[in-house]
Structure formats: C-alpha cells, structure tokens
Amino acid sequence: MSEIGLVKIYFGKVRDLYEIDDKRMLMVASDRLSAFDVILDDPIPSKGEILTQISNFWFKKLAHIMPNHFTGQTVYDVLPENEAKALEKRAVVAKKLTPVKVEAIVRGYLAGSGWKDYQKTGSVCGIQLPEGMQEAQQLPEVIFTPSTKAAVGDHDENISFEECGRIIGKELAEEVRAKAVRLYTEAAEYAKSRGIIICDTKFEFGLDENGTLTLMDEVLTPDSSRFWPADQYKVGTNPPSFDKQFVRDWLEQSGWNKKAPAPKVPADVIQKTVEKYREALTLLTQD
C-alpha cells in the first residue's frame, strides 16, 4: 500500500488510521486478512477497496437512522493529489470519535459462536431461545449479543446485556441495542431483496464531542458480517458465505494451531475469496 505523509496513529487488523487534525482522521482499509484473530501474511488483492465501497454504500443508505463518521470531505481535501489518487477507493476522511467500549453484535439467524452456545446452553449470550432449533435457522426475533473489544491479537468475549450496561452505562447500552437492531433489520430486509441473507453482523459506535451516538468504522461488510446467498440457504446446514469463510475453512483443515504465524494460503483460495467479496459488492450495489 502507498506511503502517505500523515502520521499513523493506529495499526489495526485490517484498517490503519492517520492523524489529520484534532477533529478528523484518515481511515485506510488495507488488503490484510485476519482469521482467528491472526493477521495472515497473504493479502487479498483489492479487498480494502471492495470493503470501503460496501461500507460507504451502507453508511449512506442508513444515514436516516443515525449520524455516521463521514465528514463530507474526500481524500483530495487532505492529501496531495498523487497520494489521494492511490488511496481514493480505500480511504475515508472520518470524524474522530470516542469509541464505545463494546462490539455491537446483532444476530438474525443461529450460526457460528451463537450456534455453539445454543447447543451447550439452549441460549445465546444469556438470551433463552426455543428448544429444538437447528443450525442456520432464523431466530424468532433479532437479538443483540454484545462482546468486549479486544486489542489486536486478543479474542473478543461475548457478554450479557447486563454486563454491557456495567461497562458503558445502562442508558447508552439501551441506545446502542435499539440502534444496532434497527440498522440490522433495515439492512437485512434490503439485502434479502438483492439475494443476500445477512445472518449476523457487528457494528462499531462512537460518541462525538456532544456525546451523540455515531456509527463508525465499517458497516455490513463481508468482514464484519456473515452474508449467505439466499438461493443456497438451507436450515440445518452451514450455508456458504460471501466472505473469508473460504480461507477460514482452509485454515481449519490445514491443522494450524490458530497461533501466529499462520500458514501460507494457496493462490486459488485467495482468488476465490476475492471473487466472493466482489460478488457481494455487485449484488448489493448494482442498479
């Protein structure tokens, strides 16, 4: 990825943040891929550009629900032209916000860690569910299952809503839950009309200088969500998905112990992953 003249203030699993001034920062989506909380050596070509386009699409589409991190400026307003040109498809000029210290996870279907939790306890993150549910089944209602925010290399931990309230305050927890459920519900309805089932997703929120809850980071991408092709969806199975599942499945069967460093991922697995990301972008955004 191109070098730029701004000071880097954060290096994440996928995104890097650069200082613009005390109110704004540049968020750049790389082609890095993380799986099982380990950053892989092999990038996924164009992934950062595809994720940024999907995120920007949703930020605009859902702007009537709540404010987001957009400043209304482009990279050309803050970078020299040659730097801006290299990053225009993968960078966003974002407001500096105080992050809310929980991950806002919303689930509409029973899958992943939720399915494992249900098999053991009959509930997901302390929310009791009906008996006899199957993998990938739609939940009776959308549920909010927050988790703690881990540092790079650590694992997020699922927590109860009560614990979420203790971490960020009851009133803010209520607002985060209400907004996250509404964002998911509207997005899931739209995506379904385009042939994608959004099984679950993770939102990130921040507070602006006035304490207003604001949507930030990335929204409803194949990295932050589980997207299933509607035409291949079947209850009782683990449906294929438009995301890094290809890579995760390959790593699972490779015998890797899920600690850094990760094994080298074959080129055909990387190629299939790029195609899945592109397909999701096309389905969601084409007219």
Curated annotation (Swiss-Prot):
The family classification in the record reads: Belongs to the SAICAR synthetase family.
Can you name the source organism?
Neisseria meningitidis serogroup B (strain ATCC BAA-335 / MC58)
Does this UniProt record's set of keywords contain Plastid?
no
Q: Which InterPro entries match?
A: SAICAR_synt/ADE2_N (IPR028923), SAICAR_synth (IPR001636), SAICAR_synthetase_CS (IPR018236)
> NCBIfam families of this UniProt entry?
PRK13961.1, purC
The protein's Enzyme Commission number: 6.3.2.6
What is the name listed in the Swiss-Prot or TrEMBL entry for this protein?
Phosphoribosylaminoimidazole-succinocarboxamide synthase
What's an example Gene Ontology biological process for this entry? 'de novo' IMP biosynthetic process
Query: Which Pfam families does this one have?
Result: SAICAR_synt
What keywords are annotated for this sequence in UniProt? ATP-binding, Ligase, Nucleotide-binding, Purine biosynthesis
List all disulphide bridges recorded for this chain.
none
Give the reactions, separated by semicolons, that this protein catalyses.
Answer: 5-amino-1-(5-phospho-D-ribosyl)imidazole-4-carboxylate + L-aspartate + ATP = (2S)-2-[5-amino-1-(5-phospho-beta-D-ribosyl)imidazole-4-carboxamido]succinate + ADP + phosphate + 2 H(+)
Molecular functions (GO terms): ATP binding; phosphoribosylaminoimidazolesuccinocarboxamide synthase activity
Pathway info? Purine metabolism; IMP biosynthesis via de novo pathway; 5-amino-1-(5-phospho-D-ribosyl)imidazole-4-carboxamide from 5-amino-1-(5-phospho-D-ribosyl)imidazole-4-carboxylate: step 1/2
Does the record's keyword annotation contain Ligase? yes
